[in-house]
């Protein structure tokens, strides 16, 4: 049987991946490709777009074919690193939560990359002419996970700070 730390990481990753894929399925079933559904006029729309790049549109260019392989390898390495760090860590529930969120988000976006060679993005925030790049549930999970990992590592005692919290 898997230890509690692996159950936390893998269980949360599975939940994130299912929510991510479920929301993307709902968007694809209800919003035409490149369609827009206004939610809060002038602030927030639901959209159905594809992003071939990384988070927030980085490397989102159709003329770059190698980015699929880059993101595939990066996801495999991230999952391997998360499992290795989980094995090496001792009783760190915040860190396990962070790892589960990051892994679930990475795997959710990987499913899209395998299906479409792009990621389905649907949350679009803007103000006037300013637009934040569209994103999805997987991106949210990765960002929250990265923040929690930072918090967990910052809380670790260091030789310079001693064991004070």
UniProtKB/Swiss-Prot annotation:
<keyword id="KW-0472">Membrane</keyword>
<keyword id="KW-1133">Transmembrane helix</keyword>
<dbReference type="InterPro" id="IPR001872">
    <property type="entry name" value="Peptidase_A8"/>
</dbReference>
<dbReference type="GO" id="GO:0006508">
    <property type="term" value="P:proteolysis"/>
</dbReference>
<keyword id="KW-0997">Cell inner membrane</keyword>
<feature type="transmembrane region" description="Helical">
    <location>
        <begin position="66"/>
        <end position="86"/>
    </location>
</feature>
<feature type="active site">
    <location>
        <position position="121"/>
    </location>
</feature>
<keyword id="KW-0378">Hydrolase</keyword>
<dbReference type="Pfam" id="PF01252">
    <property type="entry name" value="Peptidase_A8"/>
</dbReference>
<keyword id="KW-1003">Cell membrane</keyword>
<keyword id="KW-0812">Transmembrane</keyword>
<comment type="pathway">
    <text>Protein modification; lipoprotein biosynthesis (signal peptide cleavage).</text>
</comment>
<dbReference type="GO" id="GO:0004190">
    <property type="term" value="F:aspartic-type endopeptidase activity"/>
</dbReference>
<feature type="transmembrane region" description="Helical">
    <location>
        <begin position="91"/>
        <end position="111"/>
    </location>
</feature>
<comment type="function">
    <text>This protein specifically catalyzes the removal of signal peptides from prolipoproteins.</text>
</comment>
<feature type="active site">
    <location>
        <position position="139"/>
    </location>
</feature>
<protein>
    <recommendedName>
        <fullName>Lipoprotein signal peptidase</fullName>
        <ecNumber>3.4.23.36</ecNumber>
    </recommendedName>
</protein>
<feature type="transmembrane region" description="Helical">
    <location>
        <begin position="132"/>
        <end position="152"/>
    </location>
</feature>
<keyword id="KW-0064">Aspartyl protease</keyword>
<keyword id="KW-0645">Protease</keyword>
<comment type="similarity">
    <text>Belongs to the peptidase A8 family.</text>
</comment>
<dbReference type="GO" id="GO:0005886">
    <property type="term" value="C:plasma membrane"/>
</dbReference>
């Amino acid at each position: 049987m898997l230890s509690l730390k692996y159950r936390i990481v893998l269980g949360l990753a599975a939940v994130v991946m299912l929510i991510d894929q479920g929301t993307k399925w709902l968007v694809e079933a209800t919003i035409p490709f490149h369609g827009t559904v206004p939610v809060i006029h002038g602030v927030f729309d639901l959209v159905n777009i594809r992003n071939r790049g990384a988070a927030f549109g980085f490397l989102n260019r159709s003329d770059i074919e190698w980015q699929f392989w880059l993101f595939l390898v990066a996801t495999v390495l991230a999952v391997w690193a998360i499992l290795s760090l989980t094995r090496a860590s001792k009783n760190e529930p915040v860190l396990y939560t962070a790892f589960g969120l990051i892994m679930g988000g990475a795997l959710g976006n990987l499913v899209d990359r395998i299906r479409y060679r792009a990621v389905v993005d649907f949350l679009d925030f803007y103000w006037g002419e300013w637009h934040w790049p569209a994103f999805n549930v997987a991106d949210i999970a990765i960002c929250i996970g990265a923040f929690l990992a930072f918090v967990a590592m910052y809380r670790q005692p260091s030789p310079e700070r001693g064991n004070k919290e």
